[in-house]
Each structure stands twice: as C-alpha cells, then as structure tokens.
C-alpha cells in the first residue's frame, strides 16, 4: 500500500509554474494523501529567487485559508518553507516561526559577488566565472566550500527535510567543474553526508535535475543514498 505525497513543492508565489489551488486539485486527482508546499523563504539578499516578506505573507495567508477549510477527498495541506543555508538570522527566525516544516537547502556560494549572488543552480556563466576567478578554476575547491556551507547550516537549523543534497552537480559536467566519478569528489561528498547526518532531517530524493534535462540521476547520487541508509537514515 502506498501513500502518495510530496513535500518539496513550489508554486507561483516563488519560482513554480502553477497556482496553489490548481496544484492541490492535481494532487487530489493523483490520489495524494498530503501535499506540502515549500516556497523559497526570504533569505535577505536575493528577491529574484525567494519570496520577499510581503509575498511570503501572502503565501502563508493563502495556505492557511485552505488549511482552515479542508474539502473532503482533498489531500491534507502543509505550509512549509525551503530555507537557504545563507539566509540571514532574522529570516531564519521568521521561517522557523511561520512554517509547518522546513526544507534545508544550499543554493548559494556567496550572497554578493560584484553585486550579484552566485548560486550553484543559477546563472551558469556567472558560476563558471566565479569558480575561475575565486577558485582559479578548481571545481573541487568550490565543492569543498559548498558542502561546508550546507553542512554547517543543516547542523545549525536542523530542518525536517534535507533538500537536494548535492545540487552542485547540476552544472558539473556541462561547465567541466568536476568529475562526479573522481574519487576525490566522491570522498568529499560522502564526508559531507556523514557530517550532516546528526542534523536528524529526512534526506529527500529530488528528481528536479532530471525533469529539467540537466541530469540523468536524482539528487543525491545512489552512492550517497546507500551511504545514508547504512548510517541509519
């Protein structure tokens, strides 16, 4: 017996394509028992990628209204947030206070480089330039910093869900940042996973990179998923 559900869902309130009611109806038609929305929480520096405070307030208002008037046969709704590792302290406090649950994710390497934030899943041209100029082209050094940012945030925030753990793989091949099969990278990723384990969150299997044609395997890799299982996750 299965219990169809999803906890990592984006709507038009942030970078999703559809309105919340339409997504709830689609989930009902698919037989979902629950549906969690996880809009990108305001992180304090990038309004193009996250919900500004007033938008975040509207997001919660819509979800709370739907939660207050559940319809028979529709999935149970959860009002969550995806909190970035570099979110400012006041943004983290607000997210913890407002959300039913948190997805802890690392998107950014820095919040401002020449006036623009640099995300591992953002502008590939900017990411390549950042790696060349800051890391002298060393993608493994970038990966080391990325995982440090991610692990530190997971242990600090202790989210209920760990989002796309190895998101930095998105452009690894197309930008020649590093080779996923390189033992040095694999050791780096595995070490980060082991350090993150005490945060207590559920490690999600995220197929976003596959759905958009960037990858042929999910986040995280099968190797990391098996390692997580062996750790007790």
Identify the residue ranges that each predicted region occupies.
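Active-site-adjacent C-terminal substructures of enzyme catalytic domains
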Residues: 183-233
């Amino acid at each position: 017996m299965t219990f169809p559900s999803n906890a990592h869902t984006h709507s038009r309130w942030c970078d999703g394509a559809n309105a919340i009611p339409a997504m709830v109806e689609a989930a009902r038609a698919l037989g979902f028992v629950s549906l969690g929305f996880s809009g990108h929480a305001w992180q304090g520096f990038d309004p193009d990628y996250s919900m500004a405070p007033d938008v975040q307030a509207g997001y919660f208002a819509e979800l709370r209204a739907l939660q207050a008037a559940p319809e028979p046969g529709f999935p149970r709704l959860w009002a969550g947030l995806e909190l970035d590792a570099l979110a400012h302290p006041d943004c983290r406090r607000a997210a913890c206070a407002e959300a039913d649950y948190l997805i802890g994710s690392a998107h950014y390497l820095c919040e401002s480089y020449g006036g623009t934030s640099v995300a591992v899943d953002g502008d590939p041209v900017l990411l390549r330039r950042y790696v060349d100029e800051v890391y002298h082209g060393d993608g493994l050094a970038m990966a080391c910093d990325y995982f440090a940012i991610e692990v530190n945030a997971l242990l600090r925030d202790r989210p209920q869900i760990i989002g796309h753990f190895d998101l930095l793989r998105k452009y690894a091949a197309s930008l020649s940042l590093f080779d996923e099969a390189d033992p040095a990278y694999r050791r780096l990723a595995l070490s980060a996973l082991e350090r993150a384990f005490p945060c207590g969150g559920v490690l999600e299997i995220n197929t976003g990179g596959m759905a958009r044609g960037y990858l042929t395997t999910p986040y995280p890799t099968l190797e990391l998923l098996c390692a997580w299982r062996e750790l007790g996750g």
